[in-house]
């Protein structure tokens, strides 16, 4: 039998069966190791901030401004101006952000990769990115795709006569798709299995359907009901961190420009980029309708031009919204849209490609919602009557949209960073006094250890302060000491009564030190909370026979209540923290999967997660002083007992109820009860990869390594939000 023409590799034409195929519910640790240095083509030590700061931003903007009206034959510009197209590109890059877990957003240039590059709502944006490639090519590593996409949106607005609020660089590109983001359970584009009950949207999702950035512009599931659309809009934009005023400003501001595309039936449109043929070179949605571009373009299927000034900032969106009575119609592609009743407004908007030809203004169901909903209507009418207020609101909302996932202002780069400090940035005052030195830190540790507070209390408080950090949107963390403020001080997971006691003692020590210090030296409570936690770790390590100093870098500030948005901060409350063996309620997602999610948000690797679990259990950080997972008779001593006893084959484990949430471990020989455990505890002996890690730390020769690795992982969490210092 001839083998001619056969692929020599088994993974050629067919994909082999994977572990995920065999065990679809298997715990996925890969999300803890994504975006590794092996995937990054930049040189070791490449400093993007340094590269960006060497950039001539004015020159980049000049090149982008010239590009706006340099229409290309391969993808001509509507109205001779790419500005509206680029606004949509930037909007859709940033608009995937959701507050529930801080994931999505413009921060890593993920629009370049699947699935976002092939979402139905992103149809055509493959061309937008190709149009700005010459600019990216010219400036290379000095500006990331993530920054360039947002900057291009800003320049587009400015080139159309709008004054933006500012721009900050600092978004570093990733080089592979995010694997940690849950976009929904649906397996079909535009499906909406994410709803339950009375249209209750699944957490943490924000978009209404798979493959949409926010809402269906035709109305819920294509039903052209403006009031129902308003309900979806309010829910979705709230989950994008926008209030009603910001929502109206963004929709009306964005729809001041450009048009949608629905020249023909969607059956003419070819596959999305990820499914397109090789020769299309990463471009998708190739259309067989006419020329497939310009006036023949098919995108959403809607054919809408909102204003008479589609390439110029104006108040015409509201003029049209309130100036006409609207009736339902359909686009050439059959999509629901709206036009003025009785033929009003005919010839009031320009055609995008035929000079002198005029059209009737049109609106989306999601636009009419701004008039139908009473609250949105009041805001819209106020903006209509006060165009300067509208412009200011849109400028601020656009800046928030495109910068929401960047974290604190210390990460902002470039000459156009606004000087104004905004509440949604979670501002923290920068210390303006001399910092404590090593001698001071040693003295403070001694005071803390003599205060009567236990190791468990010290470590628990520091963890509560630091573990709010989310690597997704760079929010939370120990800096600011917001653990002492609402809402964090009242979260069940933080054990409010114990927390108040610890903070009272630490607050008194802070006052005592600051009064006695000379030369203006001060210690912030944020720093002291971490110092106290470090002291607890060091004492516990010493009790286990290992002398070690936990690294500490001063410089944290203390945020005030006025600098803290309680509602915005509330989204950081964990529904689960496996590191403290805590579940806020009963969930369909197993506790061990919630642990992996928490570890990923903390930017921890699987070994770091493992060693932290083992250490925190024996240090006594469980919420409510639960005994689950405390596999030691030497509590508050930093031993590897958790792993040694977890791996002991002399223990037999059984669930304590049909819920399979809690377990008891009994001596195989005597039946005597030895330990209690949660799902989070037992997964470190059950899951093959986690067991392999546990075996490292449960070995006879691992005690010192265990302590060293715990201290390293602990310090990483304590410093996770310290963007003011260089991380190794």
Swiss-Prot record:
It catalyses: H2O2 + AH2 = A + 2 H2O; 2 H2O2 = O2 + 2 H2O. The keyword Transcription regulation does not apply. GO terms for biological process: cellular response to hydrogen peroxide; hydrogen peroxide catabolic process. GO terms for cellular component: cytosol. Its EC number is 1.11.1.21. There is a cross-link at residues 91-214 (Tryptophyl-tyrosyl-methioninium (Trp-Tyr) (with M-240)). Disulfide bonds: none annotated. Residues 1-20, 335-355 are annotated as: Disordered. Heme b binds at residue 255. It is an enzyme of class 1 (oxidoreductase). Belongs to the peroxidase family. Peroxidase/catalase subfamily. Homodimer or homotetramer. Bifunctional enzyme with both catalase and broad-spectrum peroxidase activity. This is Catalase-peroxidase 2.
């Amino acid at each position: 039998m001839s083998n001619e023409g056969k692929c020599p590799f088994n993974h050629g034409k067919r994909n082999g069966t994977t572990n995920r195929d065999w065990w679809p519910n298997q715990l996925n640790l890969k999300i803890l190791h994504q975006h590794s240095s092996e995937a990054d083509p930049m040189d070791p030590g490449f400093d993007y901030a340094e590269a960006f700061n060497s950039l001539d931003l004015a020159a980049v903007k000049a090149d982008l401004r010239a590009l706006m009206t340099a229409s290309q034959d391969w993808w001509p510009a509507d109205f001779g101006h790419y500005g509206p197209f680029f606004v949509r590109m930037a909007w859709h890059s940033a608009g995937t952000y959701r507050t529930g877990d801080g994931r999505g957003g413009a921060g890593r240039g993920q629009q370049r990769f699947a699935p976002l590059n092939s979402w139905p709502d992103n149809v055509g944006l493959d061309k937008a990115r190709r149009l700005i490639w010459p600019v990216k090519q010219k400036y290379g590593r000095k500006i990331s795709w993530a920054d360039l996409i947002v900057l291009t949106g800003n320049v587009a607005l400015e080139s159309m006569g709008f004054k933006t609020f500012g721009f900050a660089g600092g978004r570093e590109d990733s080089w592979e798709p995010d694997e940690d983001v849950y976009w929904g359970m649906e397996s079909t584009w535009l499906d909406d299995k994410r709803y339950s009950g009375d249209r209750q949207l699944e957490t943490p999702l924000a978009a209404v359907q798979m493959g949409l950035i926010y809402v269906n512009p035709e109305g819920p599931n294509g039903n052209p009901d403006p009031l129902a659309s308003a309900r979806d809009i309010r829910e979705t934009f709230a989950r994008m961190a926008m209030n009603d005023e910001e929502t109206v400003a963004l929709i009306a501001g964005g729809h001041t420009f450009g048009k949608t595309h629905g020249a023909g039936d969607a059956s003419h449109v070819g596959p999305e980029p990820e499914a397109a043929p090789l020769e299309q070179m990463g471009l998708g949605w190739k259309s067989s309708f006419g020329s497939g571009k310009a006036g023949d373009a098919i995108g959403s299927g809607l054919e809408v031009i909102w204003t008479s000034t589609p390439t110029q900032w104006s108040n015409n969106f509201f003029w049209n919204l309130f100036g006409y009575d609207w009736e339902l119609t359909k686009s050439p592609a059959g999509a629901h849209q709206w036009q003025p009743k009785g033929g009003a407004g005919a010839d009031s908007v320009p055609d995008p490609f035929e000079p002198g030809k005029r059209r009737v203004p049109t609106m989306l169901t999601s636009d009419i919602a701004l008039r139908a909903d009473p609250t949105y209507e009041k805001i819209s009418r106020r903006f209509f009557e006060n165009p300067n207020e509208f412009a200011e609101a849109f400028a601020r909302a656009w800046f928030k949209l495109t910068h929401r996932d960047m974290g604190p202002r210390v990460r902002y780069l470039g000459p156009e960073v606004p000087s104004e400090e905004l509440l949604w940035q979670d501002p923290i005052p920068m210390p303006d006094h001399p910092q404590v030195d090593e001698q001071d830190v040693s003295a403070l540790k001694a005071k803390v250890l003599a205060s009567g507070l236990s190791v468990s209390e010290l470590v628990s408080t520091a963890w509560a302060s630091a573990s709010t950090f989310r690597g997704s949107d760079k929010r939370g963390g120990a800096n600011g000491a917001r653990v002492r403020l609402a809402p964090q001080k009242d979260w069940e997971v933080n054990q409010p009564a114990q927390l108040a006691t610890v903070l009272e003692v630490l607050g008194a020590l802070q006052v005592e030190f600051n009064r006695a210090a000379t030369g203006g030296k001060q210690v912030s409570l944020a720093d002291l909370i971490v110092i106290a936690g470090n002291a607890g770790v060091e004492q516990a390590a010493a009790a286990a026979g290992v002398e070690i100093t936990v690294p500490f870098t001063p410089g944290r500030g203390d945020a005030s209540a006025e600098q803290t948005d309680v509602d915005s901060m509330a989204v950081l409350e964990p529904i689960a923290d496996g590191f403290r063996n805590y579940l806020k309620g009963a969930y369909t997602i197993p506790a061990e999967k919630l642990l992996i999610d928490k570890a990923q948000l903390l930017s921890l690797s699987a070994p770091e997660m493992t060693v932290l679990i083992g250490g925190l259990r024996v240090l006594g950080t469980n919420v409510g002083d639960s005994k689950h997972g405390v596999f030691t008779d030497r509590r508050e001593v930093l031993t590897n007992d958790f792993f040694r006893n977890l791996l002991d084959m002399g223990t037999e484990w059984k669930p304590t109820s049909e819920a399979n949430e809690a377990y008891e471990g009994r001596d195989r020989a005597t039946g005597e009860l030895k330990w209690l455990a949660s799902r989070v505890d037992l997964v470190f002996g059950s899951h093959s990869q986690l067991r392999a890690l546990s075996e490292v730390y449960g070995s006879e020769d691992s005690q010192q390594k265990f302590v060293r690795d715990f201290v390293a992982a602990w310090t990483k969490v304590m410093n996770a939000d310290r963007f003011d210092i260089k991380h190794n």
